[in-house]
């Protein structure tokens, strides 16, 4: 199985299965001299971990990282950084009676056809459990970005049809407070609409169903000049990163699809001067032009489908092509809305793209 690596200069390779012994990630290309501890990574993993509240999967994982290599006297050495996170709360018995059945909305049909074998325990490699590796790598990327004054923040923009959009202008001067407000919310939403979102979630869960949602992410203080033209556009790499997250179904930057309904006079971001620097009066483009950052905040949205594992009887097929009923196995544990715990994953993937762009930007001019 190929394609387990992401990035160019700052490259991560993840490994492990949902019900295997452990999850892990190797980071190649991290600069030397970055002060790093396991706690730096663990505090990011905490926000993604299951069982943190009643709105997420009841699977109870410690999600504590061990740094195996790439560190000396508390600093990165430039050598590959190897991280491992042990799986502690695995219950594969719930999946034993359904290994020949194609689960609606899941990857076992496509994986089985492609590879001829599939680890059906909790979805194996296709499970969102893999994202724990991304958040671990993203913690290091965020630390590097923080050292150059860049912040990445994501929040739950919507659940179902209930939106909780926040106004960027209200928070651009106090990003740490915004981050804390988001993380104080069980839904990762700083909006007054969070209670309505919770109501939609509870209703779906009581009915044995699930619900989708949208995550919005923002990067502040990214300078003009990151990203490369044509095939390595900053937004193209962000899109690839976001669409690689399990259950993601789209990508928008700036006005996104709404731009198709606007006129040029509405969408064009006019130039201005602020603090004696060239800036923009608006930011409809979302922080990039020609695939290169403009210096404005980078704003993206990522929609997530409803969780495929639902407590409803669904018609399906087995490997022999026989029609059969599929029921959620007794004892299986799933998120009623994957978009909630996707918030720190989106943050991590955005940070990984940006730190790669940061390192790449060092090679574009020799003077």
UniProtKB/Swiss-Prot annotation:
Superkingdom of the organism of origin:
Bacteria
Q: Which PANTHER family match?
A: CHORISMATE SYNTHASE
Where FMN binds, per the record, is at 125-127, 290, 305-309, 333
Q: How does it associate, per the subunit comment?
A: Homotetramer.
Q: Which cofactor does it need?
A: FMNH2
InterPro entries, sorted: Chorismate_synth, Chorismate_synth_AroC_sf, Chorismate_synthase_CS
Family of this protein: Belongs to the chorismate synthase family.
Annotated CDD domains: Chorismate_synthase
Tell me what this protein is called.
Answer: Chorismate synthase
Q: What is the lineage of its organism?
A: Bacteria, Pseudomonadati, Chlamydiota, Chlamydiia, Parachlamydiales
- GO terms, biological process: amino acid biosynthetic process; aromatic amino acid family biosynthetic process; chorismate biosynthetic process
Q: What is its EC number?
A: 4.2.3.5
Q: What does this protein do?
A: This reaction introduces a second double bond into the aromatic ring system.
Q: How is the cofactor bound?
A: Reduced FMN (FMNH(2)).
| Source organism | Protochlamydia amoebophila (strain UWE25)
GO MF term list? chorismate synthase activity; FMN binding
Catalysis: reaction(s): 5-O-(1-carboxyvinyl)-3-phosphoshikimate = chorismate + phosphate
GO cellular-component terms in the record?
cytosol
Q: Where does NADP(+) bind?
A: 48
Which enzyme class?
A: lyase
Pathway given in the UniProt record: Metabolic intermediate biosynthesis; chorismate biosynthesis; chorismate from D-erythrose 4-phosphate and phosphoenolpyruvate: step 7/7
UniProt lists the gene as aroC
Which UniProt keywords are given for this protein, alphabetically ordered?
Answer: Amino-acid biosynthesis, Aromatic amino acid biosynthesis, FAD, Flavoprotein, FMN, Lyase, NADP
* Entry annotated with the keyword Acyltransferase: no
């Amino acid at each position: 199985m190929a394609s387990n690596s992401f990035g160019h200069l700052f490259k991560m390779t993840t490994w492990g299965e949902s019900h295997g012994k452990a999850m892990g990630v190797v980071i190649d290309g991290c600069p030397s001299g970055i002060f790093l501890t396991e706690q730096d990574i663990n505090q990011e993993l905490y926000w993604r971990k299951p069982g943190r509240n009643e709105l997420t999967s009841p699977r109870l994982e410690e999600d504590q990282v061990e740094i195996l290599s790439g560190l000396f006297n508390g600093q990165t050495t430039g050598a590959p950084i190897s991280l491992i996170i042990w799986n502690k709360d695995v219950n594969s018995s719930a999946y034993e009676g359904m290994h020949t059945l194609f689960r609606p909305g899941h990857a076992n049909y496509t994986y089985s056809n492609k590879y001829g074998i599939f680890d059906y325990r909790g979805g194996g490699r296709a499970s969102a459990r893999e994202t724990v590796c991304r958040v671990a790598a993203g913690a290091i990327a965020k630390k590097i970005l923080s050292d150059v004054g860049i912040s990445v923040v994501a929040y739950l923009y919507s659940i179902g049809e209930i939106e909780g959009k926040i106004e960027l202008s209200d928070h651009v001067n106090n990003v740490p407070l915004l981050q804390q407000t988001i993380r104080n919310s069980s839904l990762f939403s700083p909006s007054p609409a969070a209670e309505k979102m919770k109501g939609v979630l509870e209703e779906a869960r009581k009915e044995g169903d699930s619900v989708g949602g949208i995550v919005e992410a923002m990067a502040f203080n990214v300078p003009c000049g990151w990203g490369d033209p044509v095939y390595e556009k900053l937004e193209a790499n962000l899109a690839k990163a976001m669409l690689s997250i399990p259950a993601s179904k789209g990508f928008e930057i700036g006005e996104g699809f709404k731009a198709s309904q606007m006129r040029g006079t509405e969408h064009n971001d006019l130039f201005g001067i602020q603090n004696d620097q060239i800036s923009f009066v608006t930011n409809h483009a979302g922080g990039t032009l020609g695939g290169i950052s403009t210096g404005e905040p980078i704003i993206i949205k990522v929609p997530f489908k409803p969780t495929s594992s639902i407590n409803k009887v669904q018609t399906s097929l087995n490997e022999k092509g026989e029609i059969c009923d599929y029921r959620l196995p007794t004892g299986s544990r799933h998120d009623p809305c994957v978009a909630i715990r996707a918030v720190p994953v989106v943050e991590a993937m955005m940070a990984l793209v940006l730190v790669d762009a940061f390192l790449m930007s060092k090679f574009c001019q020799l003077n």
